[in-house]
Amino acid sequence: MLLFSEYDKSLDNIYSSQPVVDINLGDTNKYLVRFPKFKKVTHIILAYDAENLFSKEKSSYGYFFDLEPLLSDLEDRENRGYFVVATTSNSNRQKQYNPYPRNGSENFATKHIESIFETHLPQICSDYDIELSNLIKIVMGASMGGLMSIKTSILYPAFNNIISLSPAFWFGYPGVVNDLINLNKKSICNISVGTREADVFGDDVKNIFPNDWDLDFTNNNNFYISGVERIKKELELKGFRTNFILQEEGKHNETYWNPVLKEFLLSI
């Protein structure tokens, strides 16, 4: 059972659970819950990498979405109420957040998603008196969390509003592209990539990835863009509603993802 306590003294509408053991990995995650102040709940957001949402001090790399003022502003201007359920990542993130492992490796990501939806989300909704059937449902993530948001919607199609910010496609390429056909036909896919995300690779992509991938290997920035655009193209070919943002000068961190997220949320 999840037990929630104060997350941060400056954020009195956000609560954090105790660490929850992922028995498959032997590592832990926490759950954060954010509820709107003085607003009826109209939207639920399931988010990954919760540690990077609300607090710079609690973030992994010193960047964070600064999500509370973003949501509060939208709630006031658009008469909405966002209920957020978010799960933190851990030291096994590359296993727990990769729904497309290669060579028959165990799929820890799908097991993690299933534990969220089958065990923890129902308890949270019950504790906070949230009726999911009446809400607009969003799943969001960035980088590897962007892969998780896509896979989550495939496994739990009621969460049909997908926000995938700079998805780390190379962890699951071409599996993620081939899996898109399994999305709910009512899915709306919001995808973005920046033009300056090259540093995330740490080396020339020609030295890292198979050169027979049908992507642009001319430089690291173009490689990232071409991979995300490949997902976009496949979505469009399959007839899914797709919103795509190519962020000029956009880098691979939450500071740059924040305005893109706001634009996507406005459209949902």
Map each language-model feature to its residues.
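Non-catalytic cap/lid and distal C-terminal segments of serine-dependent acyl enzymes
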Residues: 1-268
